[in-house]
Structures are given as structure tokens and as C-alpha cells.
Amino acid sequence: MKRLKYRVTKDHQASFAYAMISAEGDEVSVGREDQEMPGWFWCRDSKGVEMWVPSSYIDIEGSRGKFNQNYNSMELNAKVGDFVQFLGEALGWVECLNHEWRYGWIPKDKLTKIQKNASQIPDPLS
């Protein structure tokens, strides 16, 4: 099975050292929407963890939201030249794994899709 891979074109340092990990059905308090990245909302879970959540992951009613799928907000630190395995995408960010099986999100504008010879890039899922 061919899997989509990306190469890191700009270094990325995670903005947060922690993550919000939520399961489908979990509820959150929904705060402000990010003005620079529309569709991302500042949310607080039942444990008090606050983090940005893409609107595609939560059903929002007023100031409350419910996850419509599992979500892990962990960002992935990456250096130029690293390769990552695509897992998903939401509002300008790519969910991925690196060659060390580290999981996280990287802004899509810091990545370029591998078009040729992607099969020669190590695949953390194989």
C-alpha cells in the first residue's frame, strides 16, 4: 500500500509541551476562534487542559463542543530534510508520524509532498 509522505521544508518547533487528548463524545468548553487561522478554537477539556482544536473535530453549540472523532493536539518538532508519513489533515495542518514513530501535527506550509520515489523513504507504518 502506498502511503503519502512529506518532506519538511522549514523547521517546526512545537508551541506547546503538552497535548489535549480526547475521545469521540468528550465535551469541551469552546472559547475564541483564532483570527490568524480561522476554524481553530481555543478549548478547555474536563481535566482543565486548554488547546487549539480544529472545528472539523468538534460539533459546537454555543460555548460547548463535543468531539465527533478522536483528537490528539500534539505538535511534532521537525527539522528541514526530515520525512513524515501523512495520517490526516485539518485546516492547514498535517497529522503525521516521523521515522521514530513520533506522532504530531506540523503546519502544511512547512511541508512538501513527495511526488517521486516515495517508496524509497522509510515508512514508519510498515
Language model features: what each stretch is:
Residues M1-S126:
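Src homology 3 (SH3)-mediated interaction modules
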